[in-house]
């Protein structure tokens, strides 16, 4: 007898079917009773079915023998076993992909679409999906193409569809042939073979009863299974949910079109074959769920008190609303955790919110979101082994393998294995540091680590760490030798069986399988059953894939295809999940079939774009292609447009979700996403909002501390409270930000009684101040020494942000060294080039202005060759791209040098010293300043290097100027100097002044200035609106700007003595504008006029005194232990812009305790007034 039971979506059809099946089982315990459900709910349905049997027996627990709860795939396995048939080997998607790639390559010349194009993995996946549809649909593509080509048939296909079918037919036939030869079964083959078995062996089901529920649609083969069971089974019962429980003629666009079409197809078959069947509509009792379902379908507008719409500030607020509501319902109303279901269109978006918040509230939950295998250490090992065979010595791949902890050398595990593993991980970290610092990659991994230490770029390069380096080298050799040996073996091996055995032996002999087993046991012993399953599931899948590969490709081993198959298979694989407890909240994806019996359901993430879930994923045969093929299909052989079916079923599926709760439904959306982009509610949310007359609850991230009414504030606060542990943060926030409230104080006191330690942590967190505390003078002395030895750049960093100075030069924290040619290293290369060029000219007693352009280039070539032989630059040159960059740098230095050569023909200043070092133990004395704060008992010694010092021996005096090379355009900024952020130019002038006798040989020594030399190849823009444009407003060419020569002029701070510049700059004899110094122009009276970067000799002396005061102030504060988070700011430039320590600072200008130290805009007069004031204080 066949029975079709129908009801509304809100009716307990699943419970009804389970009850009937349980009673049938008890009435006929010797016969098989089957409940067929979607695979997703098989476990919960089985629990419910056994529970129902126990209830009918009057027991708390029971066992069953012939009651089976199965999905379609499990049904196939059941009958294969019962018929004593060999179960076919299931073809993995990755193996199928490999077969299809082989077919396409073989047939390429015969194919139309793939003849001249590469079939990527996405396209192969689409083709495979379509092949499965064709196979399941029993479609004869060859016959279809013949019919389309027959002039007598009044049907035609468009060219795109015809070409796709042509290629598909060729690929499909070859695919079936190969699969048949290899004795594989595709993932749809199980249903096909099941149907063949049922058709030939009706005795298998003749005494069985079948109950089918929770389907709204069947695939072609599933529908055939239902037809066969209806024909041969003793009893067949279907349960379907329609709009109002009635069965009507299906019409596309109707609310329940898909399920009505399914019923129509079945009943039509039954009638056509004269099967006895009857239809039963179960009673639909009045309930809140029915009212909501009717309202959703537009059948009346009842009072929807069971529906709560929630507008949340964020996804965090949504998740907290879920947790708080569940907590309250369980704690105050006696609900159980299994009464709650949480659905999300994209559950992955809420993984970082829901799970932590539920755990914090001690709410047990089962997340049925499938966890991907591709992040498991075994999968990472396999994937990166493939990368190393593709490119030997791939550093990220090699380090990833080391970090999997699957290949730990034995010598680490002797004795205490846990301590040994910790030591291994420390060594891996150090080896990674060493490799990144020295740019070790590819073939360089074959070299001993000591070969790289000459560069001296990391602490491990030093002799004192040789033993540690030897240990790291042993570790390097362990991995490199083993992986290289495996690579050689696999690349040379042609026999698949031998190659797979070599690969498997590599894993086993190196302890991978033993390691996985150890992880499994450890997780099992700790009670984490989910984690305990993962190593075994990964290993079993690997074994299955190895077997598949040998079946697909038993002879000609291709290592690239082998690893490609493994990677592809694991990237699509998921871990099987099991609930840790039967009493747990269920988290699931919206759109998946769910069991009944939930009291309250949350649908979160109901934002526009998420609901409805319109599917537009690309398929090989598009909706348009399938529409043009529709006329060629018949009742028993066709292709379904599954995408269109899903889209047509959206409102029905949402109705299913609404009907899952017997008591209450919550629907929420966040107003912003994780990127702080504004979100609109879903059209479904808006539709329901109208039904409840705009009744909407607003879930805030935090209680509203602006609420003045104490009663209302208390009410709001209570809505955030759950367990003492989870509530403490909100209570601390309320206590901190609201007026004194007896309620808040009492709640805080109660929470502290349960969570004293957590309360202290939160109190500390609320009082957290990211501003550092000063250290004692004793500790400062231990960090810096009794006297401070420092450089100008270090003191500048102190004035830029003193906390950074402490981290860098006090604690000596450094970012990890990496072998990259960054801006600092490029600047060093420029400096080194000009330094050696000057030394070479002095060695050969050559004046640069006497050299020809070619001679200078030859000299530069010699210098560059010498530089690139240095260990550091040899290390950089291991990267081919760096070799290119050095050539670019060389063009820049050539341009600057040639410009200098030309200008020296008009300038009498001569480069005398390059990279002139000063300070203790140097020929040139540094600044040594006693510190008044310490009564002169302590001092600061300044050391450093001046890029270049130029001298001119005149009749009356010696003039000196210093040059500082810069990779970006610089000018002397008064505010930055006044604040100490830019000390360099004036401090270096002070050093020259202090060494006047040495530099001038006892003669009169005068400072000309300190200048920046911009090292650049930049040109001026043709159409720029600035003064640097090549053409003026009358479109006249500015010849002085050609080639960007103006950018190479010296700029900086000038001593305002026109006569001195006329002494050294010959161009000033002919014109008022200097060709060497930017901005230097004589006026009619022979002076410079008023300019902020020109200072008289007396003013310059004041600046030199002022810079000493700044140096002394900084040193005194450093040695006193003063530390402050006080970054400067000037326009868009801040003391944090290029900092390596931002993650330590946590600087946030929104915090009341964090603020920038803004530099004022200063004119020359302002600066001099400031200088005079400070110097008076110093006296």
Swiss-Prot record:
Pfam families in the record: ADDB_N, PDDEXK_1
Key words of the record: ATP-binding, DNA damage, DNA repair, DNA-binding, Exonuclease, Helicase, Hydrolase, Nuclease, Nucleotide-binding
A GO biological-process term: double-strand break repair via homologous recombination
Domain of life: Bacteria
Cofactor: Mg(2+)
Enzyme class of the recorded protein, top EC level: hydrolase
One Gene Ontology molecular-function label: double-stranded DNA binding
InterPro entries assigned: ADDB_N (IPR049035), DNA_helicase_suRexB (IPR014141), P-loop_NTPase (IPR027417), PDDEXK_AddAB-type (IPR038726), Restrct_endonuc-II-like (IPR011335)
Annotated EC: 3.1.-.-
Keyword tRNA-binding: no
Note: Despite having helicase-like domains, this subunit does not have helicase activity.
Protein task: The heterodimer acts as both an ATP-dependent DNA helicase and an ATP-dependent, dual-direction single-stranded exonuclease. Recognizes the chi site generating a DNA molecule suitable for the initiation of homologous recombination. This subunit has 5' -> 3' nuclease activity but not helicase activity.
Assembly description: Heterodimer of AddA and RexB.
Family affiliation: Belongs to the helicase family. AddB/RexB type 2 subfamily.
Name of the protein: ATP-dependent helicase/deoxyribonuclease subunit B
The organism of origin for this protein: Lactobacillus delbrueckii subsp. bulgaricus (strain ATCC 11842 / DSM 20081 / BCRC 10696 / JCM 1002 / NBRC 13953 / NCIMB 11778 / NCTC 12712 / WDCM 00102 / Lb 14)
Lineage: Bacteria, Bacillati, Bacillota, Bacilli, Lactobacillales
Gene name, Swiss-Prot/TrEMBL: rexB
